[in-house]
């Protein structure tokens, strides 16, 4: 089973050397505890061992292990899609949401539409409804800006450099996400997003949580709350105060 760690990491082409080392350490420790035969019982024992760690460390290890477990399930190495959960008592101790390790979102996916939706929310803080309404005419790749129109209001947001290559192939369309030159429905968007986050080992992530991750990353980068509110199209910073 230990050799599957290398195979798992080989599929994560977008990870840095340090990130791969972190994954390798966590997964080797995981296999040391659960042994060669993964079962509900061995996973419960492993979860119990994590209880004394900091919440951030627990979340990191659980995230890495869940991605690895999903990889094993996809490859037919295990007969069920096992999944670790953060202990309820640990969840209650968490006063503020924490930044999740989502580097895997930049890697290739069998759900490219869901991947792009996730990246637009995570990197720009956009709502699914805003994304579905985006027309290619609203995008200027040269100046790295996007015009968001909502009701009678408009705002201009900066497109991160990393997203330019993701958007460029779609510039010949009418809408960013379309079928027959018409935008997809919200239900379609949520299905695509759901399939993508499940593929990456984060089945509980929603558009709301990804938008929250955008906010947390902005705050970590010392961006002013008023500037964050402007990027999100919020009229006040009241809903952002809890993230201080």
Curated annotation (Swiss-Prot):
Active site: 150, 211, 243
Gene Ontology molecular function: DNA binding; tyrosine-based site-specific recombinase activity
Keyword list, A-Z: Cytoplasm, DNA integration, DNA recombination, DNA-binding
Cellular localisation: Cytoplasm
CDD domains: INT_StrepXerD_C_like
Knockout or disruption consequences: Cells display severe growth defects.
GO biological process, one term: resolution of DNA recombination intermediates
Transmembrane segments: none
Any Gene Ontology CC annotation: Holliday junction resolvase complex
Keyword Endoplasmic reticulum attached: no
Domain Tyr recombinase: 90-244
Core-binding (CB) domain residues: 1-73
Pfam families attached to this UniProt entry: Phage_int_SAM_1, Phage_integrase
HAMAP family named in the record: Recomb_XerD_like
Family: Belongs to the 'phage' integrase family. XerD-like subfamily.
Known role: Putative tyrosine recombinase. Not involved in the cutting and rejoining of the recombining DNA molecules on dif(SL) site.
Cited NCBIfam families: PRK02436.1
Protein name: Tyrosine recombinase XerD-like
Organism from which the protein derives: Streptococcus pneumoniae (strain ATCC BAA-255 / R6)
Phylogenetic placement of the source organism: Bacteria, Bacillati, Bacillota, Bacilli, Lactobacillales
């Amino acid at each position: 089973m230990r050799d599957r760690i290398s195979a798992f990491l080989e599929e994560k082409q977008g990870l840095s050397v340090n990130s791969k080392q972190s994954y390798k350490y966590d997964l080797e420790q995981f296999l040391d505890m659960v042994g060669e035969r993964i079962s509900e019982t061995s996973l419960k024992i492993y979860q119990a061992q994590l209880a004394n760690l900091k919440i951030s460390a627990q979340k990191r290890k659980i995230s890495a292990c869940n991605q690895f477990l999903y990889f094993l399930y996809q490859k037919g190495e295990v007969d069920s899609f096992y999944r670790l959960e953060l202990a309820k008592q640990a969840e209650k101790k968490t006063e503020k949401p924490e930044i999740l390790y989502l580097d895997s979102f930049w890697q290739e996916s069998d759900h490219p539409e869901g991947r792009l939706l996730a990246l637009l929310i995570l990197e720009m803080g956009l709502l699914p409804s805003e994304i579905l309404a985006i027309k290619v005419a609203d995008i200027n790749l040269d100046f790295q800006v996007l015009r968001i129109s909502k009701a009678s209001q408009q705002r201009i947001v900066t497109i991160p450099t990393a997203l330019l290559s993701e958007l460029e192939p779609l510039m010949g369309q009418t809408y960013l996400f379309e079928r027959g030159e018409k935008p997809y429905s919200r239900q379609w968007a949520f299905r695509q997003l759901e399939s993508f986050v499940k593929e990456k080992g984060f089945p509980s992530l929603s558009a709301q949580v990804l938008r929250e991750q955008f906010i947390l990353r902005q705050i970590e980068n010392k961006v002013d709350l008023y500037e964050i509110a402007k990027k999100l199209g919020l009229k006040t910073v009241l809903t952002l105060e809890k993230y201080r």
